[in-house]
């Protein structure tokens, strides 16, 4: 096929400014054995061999039945920049075993990914075990050298996007989700990747300022407990004045807040003497700094007896001067109970002081939240509008790695298979195409792998789908729609598709998830999604298996 037939006409070169967002991703970000294998291939005169590798995973993460594919754009950036610098070559000369021929280093210095072709499913698409999410064709040595880096770029990205998508599903579409995990992430790059791919998976924003700049993700945040505890009395307020939003006249915000606090103490049955004066001072100070964006942490001392009283007083004071507060954050305690208490408080204030917008104040909850926490809060009838989630999200608490693998399936047109006593680790040989078959109601029924030489399944035509390793498991499927999963994304040194924005990938995730039946997505005991092979590929796999499996001998 030529470039035009592959959709590569004209190509798309990677923006070099975008390419260098992470300078760590380079050819030396690999395992040593990739380079020693490359030398052995070179010594064996295999530089002209053409290979096909499949990048796939064997099991879905988090005890679920789907995975979100992410990281493709980063893989394309890596291919675009793939080149060993002179300093790389000098380092390898010092590091590799003695006796490596000088010509090999010259060979490495001239390597690029120009002769590589990369096929992939669209980033943001739901993917399933054994179906390759990336397929790489090209010179054996080059595609071997790509292995570790591609796995690094796909494994965490897909795991993170999947984790975020699961949080989105349990939280519901009307609750905001914010990623607060930078300080708990596995290093700076882990923090950036977590912010990027949590947004991909369905989160609404991040606290990570650099991620906001690099990826155009909405940046959100309030303040820490330290801000509240840095004040101990109202006497510490250096300024109390703020301009009225409409008139521009300077007014004493503290004076308004103190007056409202006295009235609120009767309404809420809370003594002003029990509430923290330092907390009130801190909230007044913060409100003066951000009168249109006032959101306060209310659990520094006592949510009921201090935080809600002081917040409501300052919010009403801002209202006197033409401003509307945004809401509160609760970072400890019984989140279900406290959120209900806060909502009840706001409703009382709205009615008593004739401020209907108080009913719409946002309640943000944080504090080591995970999937199970949200499910429990849902059962308790919480009133939380937004979750700030950090540690368990970015560290993927329930499963720290996805386990993608990169396996040789064909060389010089000849299929290759890896055998194992563990059937799960037997590879599916040969160059393959993948199709997703849909029912009449638009739900995905099954993913089907075929040899590239086979014609694609046809709409309305019966297709025999077989389990790749269990002979008795087979079924006829009559698809109402057939989707070819692979597109050529890289060929002849060019990107062959218009790359989507992060926002478009994020939308793709939700669209793709909607194609799955609810029983595939449920948290408890989800129904496994079926992945099958064609009858032709089934016979091909098992014939090759028998050809390569040693025959035992008993005596």
Swiss-Prot record:
The Gene Ontology CC terms held by the record are: cytosol
Q: Which reaction does it catalyse?
A: nicotinate + 5-phospho-alpha-D-ribose 1-diphosphate + ATP + H2O = nicotinate beta-D-ribonucleotide + ADP + phosphate + diphosphate
Phosphohistidine (modified residue): where? Answer: 225
User: Which cofactors, if any, are listed as required?
Assistant: Mg(2+); Mn(2+)
- Report the EC number(s), separated by commas if there are several: 6.3.4.21
The molecular function terms in GO held by this entry are: metal ion binding; nicotinate phosphoribosyltransferase activity; transferase activity
Entry keyword set: Ligase, Magnesium, Manganese, Metal-binding, Phosphoprotein, Pyridine nucleotide biosynthesis, Transferase
Q: Which residues bind 5-phospho-alpha-D-ribose 1-diphosphate?
A: 391
* Pathway(s) where this gene product acts: Cofactor biosynthesis; NAD(+) biosynthesis; nicotinate D-ribonucleotide from nicotinate: step 1/1
Cofactor: binding comment: Activity is highest with Mn(2+).
Q: For this chain's UniProt record, which GO biological process terms are given?
A: NAD biosynthetic process via the salvage pathway; response to oxidative stress
Claim: S-adenosyl-L-methionine is one of the keywords in the record: no
**Which positions does UniProt annotate for nicotinate binding?**
33, 180, 222
Entry-linked Pfam families: NAPRTase, NAPRTase_C, NAPRTase_N
What is the recorded function of this protein according to its Swiss-Prot or TrEMBL entry? Catalyzes the first step in the biosynthesis of NAD from nicotinic acid, the ATP-dependent synthesis of beta-nicotinate D-ribonucleotide from nicotinate and 5-phospho-D-ribose 1-phosphate. Helps prevent cellular oxidative stress via its role in NAD biosynthesis.
Query: Which PANTHER family does the record cross-reference, listed alphabetically?
Result: NICOTINATE PHOSPHORIBOSYLTRANSFERASE
What is this protein's name?
Nicotinate phosphoribosyltransferase
What is the species listed in this Swiss-Prot or TrEMBL entry? Drosophila melanogaster
């Amino acid at each position: 096929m030529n470039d035009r037939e592959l959709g590569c006409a004209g190509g798309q070169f990677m923006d070099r400014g975008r390419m260098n967002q992470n300078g760590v991703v380079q050819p030396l970000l690999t395992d040593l054995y990739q380079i020693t294998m490359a030398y052995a291939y070179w010594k064996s005169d295999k530089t002209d061999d053409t290979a096909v590798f499949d990048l796939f995973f064997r099991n879905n993460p988090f005890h679920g039945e789907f995975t979100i594919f992410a990281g493709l754009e980063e893989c394309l950036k890596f291919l675009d920049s793939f080149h060993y610098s002179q300093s790389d070559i000098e380092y390898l000369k010092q590091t590799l075993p003695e006796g490596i021929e000088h010509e090999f280093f010259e060979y490495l210095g001239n390597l690029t990914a120009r002769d590589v072709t990369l096929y992939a499913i669209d980033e943001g698409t739901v993917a399933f075990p054994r179906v390759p999410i990336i397929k790489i064709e090209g010179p054996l040595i080059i595609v071997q050298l790509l292995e570790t880096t591609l796995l690094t770029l796909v494994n965490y990205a897909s795991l993170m996007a999947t984790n975020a998508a699961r949080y989105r599903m349990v939280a519901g579409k009307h609750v905001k989700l914010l990623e607060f995990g930078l300080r708990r992430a596995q290093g700076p790059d882990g923090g950036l990747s977590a912010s990027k791919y949590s947004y991909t998976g369905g989160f609404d924003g991040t606290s990570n300022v650099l991620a906001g700049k690099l990826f155009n993700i909405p940046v959100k945040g309030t303040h820490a407990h330290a801000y509240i505890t840095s004040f101990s009395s109202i006497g510490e307020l250096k300024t109390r004045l703020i301009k009225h939003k409409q008139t521009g006249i300077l007014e004493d915000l503290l004076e308004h807040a103190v007056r409202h606090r006295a009235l609120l103490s009767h309404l809420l049955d809370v003594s002003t003497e029990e509430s923290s004066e330092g907390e009130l001072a801190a909230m007044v100070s913060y409100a003066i700094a951000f009168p249109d964006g006032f959101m306060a942490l209310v659990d520094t001392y006592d949510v009921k007896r201090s935080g809600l009283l002081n917040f409501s007083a300052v919010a009403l004071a801002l209202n006197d001067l033409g401003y509307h507060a945004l809401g509160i954050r609760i970072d400890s305690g019984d989140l279900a109970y406290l959120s209900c208490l806060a909502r009840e408080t706001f409703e009382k204030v709205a009615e008593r002081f004739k401020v209907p917008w108080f009913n719409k104040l946002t309640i943000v909850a944080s504090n080591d939240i995970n999937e199970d926490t949200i499910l429990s809060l849902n059962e308790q009838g919480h009133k939380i509008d937004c979750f700030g989630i950090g540690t368990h999200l970015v560290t993927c608490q329930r499963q720290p790695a996805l386990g993608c693998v990169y396996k040789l399936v064909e060389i010089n047109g000849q299929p290759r298979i890896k055998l194992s006593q563990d059937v799960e680790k037997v590879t599916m040989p040969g160059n393959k195409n993948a199709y997703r078959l849909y029912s009449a109601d638009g739900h995905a029924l099954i993913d089907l792998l075929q040899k590239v030489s086979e014609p694609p399944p046809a709409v309305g035509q019966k297709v025999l789908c077989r389990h790749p390793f269990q002979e008795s498991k087979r079924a006829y499927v009559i698809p109402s729609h057939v989707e070819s999963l692979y597109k050529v994304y890289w060929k002849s040194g060019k990107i062959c598709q218009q790359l989507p924005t992060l926002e478009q990938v994020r939308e793709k995730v939700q669209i793709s998830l909607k194609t799955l039946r609810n029983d595939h997505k449920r948290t408890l005991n989800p129904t496994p999604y079926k992945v099958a092979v064609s009858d032709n590929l089934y016979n091909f796999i098992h014939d090759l298996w028998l050809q390569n499996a040693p025959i035992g001998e008993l005596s």
